[in-house]
Amino acid sequence: MENIIIQNQEKFDEKLKVIVSGGIDKLHVRMDFDGTITKAIVGGKIVPSLISVLRDEDFLGADYSQKAHALYNKYHAIEIDPVVSVADKKIAMRKWWETHFDLLIEKGFSKCHIQRALQSARIRLRDGFGEFAAMLVKNKIPLVIMSCSGMGVDMIKMVLEKNNVLFDNMRIVTNQYEWNDDGVAIAVKEPIVHTLNKDEESIRRIPDAYKTIKNRPNVLLLTDSVADITMADGAKIGTLLSFGFLNSNIDKQLGAFEKNFDAVLLNDAPMNFPKDILKNVCGK
């Protein structure tokens, strides 16, 4: 338990009791992808996202990498600035994603680049995710993966498939490219999903995803970002039990994580604790 902080044990236990009482038929799970399903630290270095692999490993040339890093430096500063309003941040995030997608298309981003990025040793699933995902599918509990990935739904599916954890109980809410016959990206479909609009509305836009969860009011929510607590905004939630993976800058971010999450998991922790909670719910 040394990597787990539960600020209010009584509240945590009360929520868990309600979820267990409701049973698996009333439960679904919502997870972020980058830094939650994937490991955030590989070989001692931070891997913030799938798109960072494309950006850092020079697959699209030096000009792309330079411009992509410049966009990150400009807009990430706005994203984490406590003085900037949420409304202004949402405008900035939309602009960041639009500009980056335009840059990717300009540089000829294709499915071949996804295949190359997929081979990167920096893309690894969080320890224990496979067992967690297998338990969900065995008990017919839906998993909604909510991601603002710049690599799109194709990359996420390929990562899961490569690791033999792409299951039919999963629904992926993220960005989608339009490809030409040669597998080259020519556009991005609306709506664009960015860091600050991953919410219930984004699920409702995908009828198949919403259908699987609409009668399952209890939620386990797992993410590595305080901003992602909004992944349940707008939903008719019964009981929400949230897990925050605090992977880096612990001293700086711990207070915010403790305030927003029922449980905080430190240092790129494995999935052991969420697995134990799920076993409890499933009666295992």
Task: Write out the residue ranges for each language-model feature.
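Alpha-helical substrate-recognition element adjacent to the catalytic core
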Residues: 1-181, 259-261
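C-terminal cap/substrate-recognition subdomain and adjoining C-terminal extension
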Residues: 1-3, 12, 120-145, 149-284
